[in-house]
Every structure is written in C-alpha cells, then in structure tokens.
Swiss-Prot record:
Assembly and binders: Component of the cytochrome c oxidase (complex IV, CIV), a multisubunit enzyme composed of a catalytic core of 3 subunits and several supernumerary subunits. The complex exists as a monomer or a dimer and forms supercomplexes (SCs) in the inner mitochondrial membrane with ubiquinol-cytochrome c oxidoreductase (cytochrome b-c1 complex, complex III, CIII).
Record gene name: COX3
Lineage: Eukaryota, Viridiplantae, Streptophyta, Embryophyta, Tracheophyta
Keywords from the named record: Membrane, Mitochondrion, Mitochondrion inner membrane, Translocase, Transmembrane, Transmembrane helix
A single MF term (Gene Ontology): cytochrome-c oxidase activity
GO cellular component, one term: mitochondrial inner membrane
Protein name as catalogued: Cytochrome c oxidase subunit 3
Entry keyword annotation includes Acetylation: no
Entry EC number(s): 7.1.1.9
Amino acid sequence: MIESQRHSYHLVDPSPWPISGSLGALATTVGGVMYMHSFQGGATLLSLGLIFILYTMFVWWRDVLRESTLEGHHTKVVQLGPRYGSIPFIVSEVMFLFAFFWASSHSSLAPTVEIGGIWPPLGIWVLDPWEIPFLNTPILLSSGAAVTWAHHAILAGKEKRAVYALVATVSLALVFTGFQGMEYYQAPFTISDSIYGSTFFLATGFHGFHVIIGTLFLIICGIRQYLGHLTKEHHVGFEAAAWYWHFVDVVWLFLFVSIYWWGGI
C-alpha cells in the first residue's frame, strides 16, 4: 500500500553515499599525510581516496538530479534549501580568500627586515598588472555578463539562447584560465620566493581553482540546458552556478587591485 504525501518536503531514501564520501575523505587525509612524510603507499592511498571522493560526488549528484528532474521531488519548498545553503557557502569562501588578502596587506604594509624592509621584497621582479592581468579582467567580467544573459534566457523560456550564452561563458572562462596558466609559466618568481611569492600564488591560485570549479559547474548546467532539464520554474542548480560565478568575478577585481596593482607598486 502506497501512502500519500501530505506535505511539500522530500523525504530522501537511505543512501550509501555519505559513508562512502567519508571513507574517501579519510583515505585522502591519511594518504596525504603519508605522502608528505614519504611513507610507502602514501601516494597510492591518496590517489584511491581522491578517486573515491570523485566517484561519490558523481553518483550522489546523479541521484539528486534524478530526484529533482525525473521524479519531481524538488518542490518550491525543497528548492529553498539549496538556495539558502548556497549563500553561506559562498560567504565562507569569501572569508577564506579574505585571509589571503589580509596576509598580503599585513606583509606589504609592515615589511620585515628579512625581506629588505621594502615591498615588493628585494630581488623580486613583479608582474606588470597592465599586461595579462588587465587583459583577463574584461574577459572574466564578460563571462559574468554572459551568464546573466543565460539566466534571462532561461526565465524567458528561450532554451537555445540560454545554451549559446552558456557556451560563451564557458569559452571565456577557458580563455581566462589559459592566460592565467601562461602568466604562471612566465612568472619570474615562485611560491617559495619570500612572502610575496607565497601570498601571490596562494591568492591567485585559490581564485584560479574556483574558476575551474565554476567552469565545470557551468558546463554541467549547459549540458542540462541542452537536454531540457532547466525550466523557468526549476533551475536552482543554474542559479547556484551563476551566484558562484559572480562571486569569482568580484574576487578577481579585488585581486587585481590589491595583489597585482597596489601590491606590485
């Protein structure tokens, strides 16, 4: 006998993915520590843990998409959860990046004698902010405009236009990442070159990591839009991706001003 549901909430079925994700995280942590201390088998355990985590992410999100798209479990009330959950997640990422900005500002405003008492430190050849960084700025901001275009297209029910906009967004993101990689390759300093190199590569690298994650997020949204999964009433996943991408845009502006321009004077 099937009982009727008299509420708008989704009661999920028992799932093995939380425990499998926990085991993957445990293997990754232990393997990472073993690898850093040159223990035998550390690299193997680390690799297996990462593979297990990636597999768990794939099958777990597959189940969520199936429940929302095919089974219709994600009502308007259920959709509020992912929406509200995305906000503190993005705020936590802002705080993470704020720590890198703080480290850079502290080191530049009060340079120690170990780095010559000046900023940038003695012997560091900084990157010109008006070359690749300046070129990357309109590229990334244009990708943010394209994702907004995609959002308006979804709300208007124009599926093909939304796909085109997402293709433009992802293409610009890949160009940005390519230029960033070129800049790293040509950089005259490394992450081990004083506090300047450490804060530069940590801040820009962490932002670049977010760009890559956001690009993958938008690629999935583009595939789902092409398959007809996203509608003007139901596109929470895309909204989360768009918010995340705008967060990446704003952080880049702060990076350009504080790390590249002001930090390199």
